[in-house]
Regions:
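Extracellular glycan-interacting surfaces
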Residues: 3, 17, 25, 33-417
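Positively charged N-terminal leader segments that act as targeting/secretion signals
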Residues: 4-16, 29
Length: 417
């Protein structure tokens, strides 16, 4: 505020100019132009649809709920702005108790998604890809980048698990008391002490890769999995596996799912096709037609008891059919339409209630970051790095020019005195 209320030197200092071709630009002009540019950029950002302050379904990932088997959807993450919602679990004892795994840890809701609080922040670090409740709801488990964790009445604490179990693709509760199964990067682990410790399940060859896992209701040791791109069944807790004849290198299976209403029914997907078996994989038959985008990778399947209404989540969003898969419609009302959907979760007490999670960041990218230990530098591309360096150079030049200007002002003031 030089020259105001008698503050500053008696005579104005010599103005500082930057040569720009044949023109000279003073600091006041630079400041004015800088303010004009900043205002223009602010206006542009304000007008961009992706920068809306409200929770627009197209702007964020998140959690969504349907109470009518996917016909209508509403947000179940009030007050949250999630980058990557990866998995959700519903407490079988209390349907209003939800756990959501995100790229930053776990969130919990005790009122059906109307409010959320973080859990286990002192121990659970990084992306959480797997969550499970025990059948009685007394215990909860999660697998994060930082380890496998068990929650009981005393809170979250670390479980004992081999390093190869992290990160984990899936956590499922077995029908037997205190039984949990965990699918790590490619191997199967089991706990028989209520999730306090996990050990590898022998039987799978070292060259095989398991990529999906589900427990079949009604049997303590009955599991279904995707192994080497094929749908497999085990009736002894994963020690031995039977090839069901669906899938393979030419048509790799995306996922496999149990049915909420029929214990002997399992679902699978490959190449945009949805198939079902009513006898645990002894026979398969296709459901209707392929999805509109055959290249879509299916992440979850939910169906009515008569298999006429189907809901499918995929990396291309959510699809629904009301005629047994003869026609498919993408669900766009209140749901994101351009980001990936994760696995579906059904309310154990109401088969018509479904939860879906969406991630603004591709799941493959979140998984890669977890596998690599969260090295953020590995995710910086050349253009981003060049932009950052350019900004640093610009700031350095500005600092040098400001220092020169201040030096000249001081010299002028000193000479006048």
């Amino acid at each position: 505020m030089n020259g105001v209320l008698g503050v500053g030197p008696a005579f104005p200092p010599r103005p500082f100019f930057i040569e720009a071709g044949k023109k000279q630009i003073g600091l006041r002009q630079l400041a004015l132009r800088g303010r004009q540019l900043a205002l223009a950029l602010a206006c542009m950002l304000f007008l961009l649809p992706g920068t809306a302050s409200s929770h627009d379904a197209s702007s964020y990932g998140g959690v969504f709920r349907s109470r009518d088997l996917g016909a209508a959807w509403l947000n179940a993450d009030v007050g949250l702005f999630l980058n990557a919602a990866l998995v959700i679990a519903v407490d079988p004892r209390d349907s209003s108790h939800l756990l959501v795994g995100t790229d930053l840890g776990i969130l919990s809701s005790r009122n059906g998604g109307r409010s959320w609080v973080p859990e286990g922040r002192d121990v659970i670090i990084g992306a959480v890809f797997a969550l499970a409740f025990s059948p009685d709801g007394e215990l909860a488990m999660c697998a994060a980048t930082s380890g496998v964790f068990l929650r009981n009445q005393n809170g979250w604490r670390r479980a004992e698990a081999p390093s190869s179990a992290i990160p984990a693709r899936a956590l499922v509760a077995g029908a037997a008391k205190d039984r949990f199964y965990l699918l790590g990067r490619s191997r199967l682990f089991a706990s028989q002490d209520g999730g306090r410790s996990f050990a590898v399940v022998p039987g799978l060859s070292q060259t095989s890769e398991m990529t999906a896992l589900v427990a079949i209701p009604g049997s303590a040791d009955l599991l279904a999995a995707v192994i080497d791109s094929r749908a497999m069944i085990s009736d002894d807790g994963g020690r031995n596996w039977r090839n069901t004849g669906f899938g393979g290198a030419d048509a790799p299976v995306d996922m496999i799912a149990a049915d909420a209403t029929r214990p002997q029914r399992i679902w699978a997907a490959a190449g945009g096709r949805i198939v079902v078996s009513d006898n645990l994989g002894a026979d398969w038959h296709s459901i209707g037609r392929s999805l509109p985008l055959p290249e879509a990778r299916v992440r979850g399947i939910a169906a009515s008891a008569d298999a006429t209404t189907l809901v499918v989540s995929s990396d291309r969003g959510v699809y629904r059919s009301e005629d047994g898969g003869q026609t498919w419609a993408p669900k766009e009302d209140n749901l994101p339409i351009h980001i990936e959907a994760g696995p579906l979760a059904r309310d154990p007490n109401d088969a018509g209630v479904i939860y879906a999670v969406f991630s603004l960041m591709p799941y493959a990218e979140v998984w890669r970051t977890a596998v690599e230990g969260g090295n953020l530098l590995a995710r910086i591309d050349t253009i981003s790095l060049a932009g950052g360096l350019s900004f640093c150079v610009l700031m350095l030049i500005g600092g040098v020019l400001a220092a020169l200007h201040l030096s000249r002002r001081r010299a002028t003031t000193h000479s006048l005195r």
